[in-house]
Amino acid sequence: MKTLKFNKKYYLPILNGDKTQTLRKDNKRLNEGETVKAVFPGTGLTCKIRILKTGYKQFQYIDDEDVKREGFHSMVELENELLRIYPKCDRFTRLYYYRFKVL
């Protein structure tokens, strides 16, 4: 089974259904309908998620729906988190999205 790593701070938001998408700079080659093991390094915590939709968009086209799916309260919050993780992002950077649900 493929794995997808998440920061431990996202464990509860994912389990609670508050975070239903992840944006990544790298293409993780996950397919719609695929079951994946979500891992939270350093915690021993895992859960299974099903990939519902995949795609990509440029950083500049992140919208309010992405903010909600990512579990953030504002565009600024999400942009700051993405820039913390990927400091070399600019508005043209391609980000892959993976929408999912916990099984």
Task: List PLM regions with ranges.
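Structured alpha/beta reader/binder surfaces that contact nucleic acids or chromatin modification marks
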Residues: 1-103
